[in-house]
């Protein structure tokens, strides 16, 4: 079954998805065969994401749209693709 999630990662091996939610992050991880211990609830819970293990970076990146670290934060904050002054910084 094909996923309705779109995966995004950056060069620092942070991994998120759209539509963004913690539940969807865990679904994405299951789809990609990631271990729950690779989940990070960074920034006191403000920046949840998965880290891609070094040995799987090529495999996982091939299944993702590679974006900047700023775009990863925008996805988490819900401002990715939104035309506003905040989305441009």
Predicted segments — roles?
Residues 1-89:
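Catalytic phosphate/metal-binding cores of nucleic-acid and nucleotide-processing enzymes, i.e., regions
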